[in-house]
Amino acid sequence: MQHTLLVTGSPYQSKACHSALCFARAALKAQPDSIKGVFFYEDAVLIGNDLAQPPRDEINLKQAWQTLASEFNLPLYLCIAAAVRRGVINESESKRYELNHHSLSHGFQLEGLGTLVELMNSTQKIIQFR
């Protein structure tokens, strides 16, 4: 059975990103193709901000997601509208808005809600973390 993970809680004000990470690790270790993709929406898109740096004595959630995604070839999608609104932009969006920099972390990609719908329609279950 394949799952889609939908994460909506802020990485800084909720346990949503951490709980989703723990679930994803366990699921992928048990069955490497059990998760088709992770879609971050609302404040959860802040996980993909390359400029955010956690204190050294805290878990680096962004880095943990990047490592997991790399290890299992897991797509990490950020809702483009929510991300741009919160200042998380890739190089092409930076040019579009005539900015000199971008802030999207490696391993994350900006996608529209159509990608979420596609994930939902192609997996057996969607699990939301808020």
Residue ranges and their predicted role:
Residues 6-8, 39-41, 80, 128-130:
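Short beta-strand segments
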Residues 54-84:
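A glycine-rich helix N-cap at a beta->alpha junction
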